Amino acid sequence: MSTKKDKFSLKDKFYMEIALKLANSRQGLTGTNPSVGCVIVKNDKIISIGQTSFDGRPHAEFNAIKNCIDDLDGSKMYVTL
């Protein structure tokens, strides 16, 4: 049994779960690229999401940044890859 303390908060796990759901929804639809999900959070609020596009490009991170209308300064990105 491990004695290491979990380094991820419940909020981190919550946002990563959303990113995983985004990735899973594109399984098999992204060509040779992996299906990836991305969630951008700022001040405990989701400000953007992204997924790997059909046929694999653009990538999830690019899509999330492109779709974001808020300032990204101070935000955190959760990515499944």
Protein language model regions, located:
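Secretory/periplasmic and organellar redox-cofactor proteins
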Residues: M1-K5
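Short, basic/aromatic recognition patches
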Residues: F8-G31
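Zn2+-dependent cytidine deaminase-like catalytic core
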Residues: K13, I40-L81
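Conserved hydrophobic/aromatic pocket- or pore-lining residues that grip, position, or stack substrates
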Residues: A19, G37, D44
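Generic detector of intrinsically disordered, low-complexity, polar/charged segments
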Residues: S25-G28, P34, I47, S53
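Acidic, glycine-enriched active-site microenvironments
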Residues: G31-V36, D73
